[in-house]
Amino acid sequence: MSRPYILISNDDGVQARGINFLIETLRPIADLLVVAPDSPRSGFGCSITSAAPIHYKKLHEEPGLTVCSCTGTPVDCVKLALNLLIDRRPDLIIGGINHGDNSSVNTHYSGTMGVATEGALQGYPSVAFSLCDHREDADFTPLASYIVDLVFKSIALGMPPFTCLNINFPKANKFKGVRICRMAHSRWQHELARRKHPYGADYFWLVGDCEELEPEATDTDRWALAHGYVAITPTNLDVTDYELLNVLKQTF
């Protein structure tokens, strides 16, 4: 049986600890093509570069491993790889491992999820991995065995069209297990902190607090992470609200 071929990108940048831990973990079991931003692109979601050229640079190449940096967004990285750089069809596309939580509302802003979303849109099984720890020196060691297991299961499962998996790990030395769960409902509030520039107009930092809209719910990604479980959320890229669709058909 041939080794799996996996495309990897992220939004923290090609030098980030998370993506390099992922490379180290998967290198013994798979052939890897890594195309990641040349600097952090956190919060870029599914954005693309349309008004500037995109450049890439090959940083490392050996049998079974190619690593490239790209001046574009996480989605640009996936598009570049799929259009120009792959040497065979990837068995899986992975975003991550992200430094920080991408559960609940963060799903919509995440460049890590942007990688998985683009992979799914292009017809490939895709997953996003995130650890609830923003530190540059975050410890990813407890994730290793879970990552390998989840990668093999994701490849074996395939995935229905226009779906991907959002997988978040709590910050812990040991996990209680895995929970399959839905996305919690939340929103960011108090998002801008005003600062005074000594020579001119005010400026702002994006900060904020995450408001939980259903704190008592026990079937969500937020609950799973808060209680020490790995949260796996199947994500559907068809954003049609079919219940409302039927209501509107009767209304208009």
Q: What residue spans do the PLM features occupy?
A:
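A cross-family phosphate/adenosyl-ligand binding-site feature
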Residues: 2-9, 17-84, 88-89
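Short glycine-rich anion-binding loops that position phosphate/pyrophosphate groups of nucleotides
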Residues: 12, 40, 73-74, 98-101, ...
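Short, Asp-centered acidic motifs that coordinate Mg2+ and/or phosphate
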Residues: 92
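Glycine/threonine-rich flexible loop motifs
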Residues: 101-110
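Hydrophobic/aromatic ligand-binding patch that stacks against planar heteroaromatic rings
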Residues: 115-119
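Glycine-rich phosphate/pyrophosphate-binding loops
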Residues: 120-142
